[in-house]
């Protein structure tokens, strides 16, 4: 008898959910009730969207290991941002994110960002300051991220000023060392000869992978480098300390590292738009605009599609999520019930300034909601 009563109760409960009964006794919902339901759903989604945006801001800072957003103005960024081929390629050909069914899951992502490319601008070391006859550039301080990854490429980029007629340019890169007994302070890294034609200046890249690897193994040996580039008349063409009109032409190091890709799983779920009347757990579109935050330190993307999850995980809908339903039935008091949450997420690539005014190109995991489900 008790079992029969339970079944009757469940049946009536399901009927109420599917066909709500108005208080006046009519079997059809009133027009006001429908409007109220839609308004409540819109309000709930708006609150979920706002919470998602705030969570994204916190996650980005945390995953990039930043205590706060770097305080870099647009004017400073204009001065620091190299006008160089590798950076332009990253910006022009930027793959903001992909919104497809490619494999990837929340569980398989690491928490912190994965670094792929680091662009390091020169600074001045104490050793360079103490030297007599200030050398022509440059000391590079390396991010700790480089030391924990496999370096696959390291190039020094220098800008050579324009020439008035066809000429041969002699480029020499020297590594500073502690003074020898004979007074020697340099050892050669690379020498090359270039033929330049009249017109605009050019960017020239030089492989310094071996030097970088030695510096990483023995940080105390990193005392800086000197850059020389003279034409046939002895005119210095290398931009080492940019003058007027030479913003963005500083020498810099482009370092690329690699990480082992992780295996992933496939998942499925509902997709909805902002005008959808779907009440079940569903994925909704959400575009995050970094410029609206005032986050100028993010070079690219300026915005990206983050998406968010919203909707109900009621008993009558649990046939779509049978595993979660069975777990809940086995231990009904173990939780407050299933919630609509991301079940599959993918990373975004990001080009940004860190707190040390270094330009980092990396991958931030779990920033795009690809699938939603009840769990």
From Swiss-Prot:
Gene Ontology BP, a term? negative regulation of myoblast proliferation
Top-level taxon of the source organism:
Eukaryota
Kindly list every residue the record annotates as glycosylated: 71
Q: Which Gene3D superfamilies match?
A: 2.60.120.970, Cystine-knot cytokines (2.10.90.10)
Report the PROSITE patterns cross-referenced here: TGF_BETA_1, TGF_BETA_2
Q: List the disulfide bonds.
A: 272-282, 281-340, 309-372, 313-374
Signal peptide interval: 1-23
Main role? Acts specifically as a negative regulator of skeletal muscle growth.
Q: What is this protein called?
A: Growth/differentiation factor 8
Give the taxonomic lineage as stored in the record: Eukaryota, Metazoa, Chordata, Craniata, Vertebrata
This chain is encoded by the gene named: MSTN
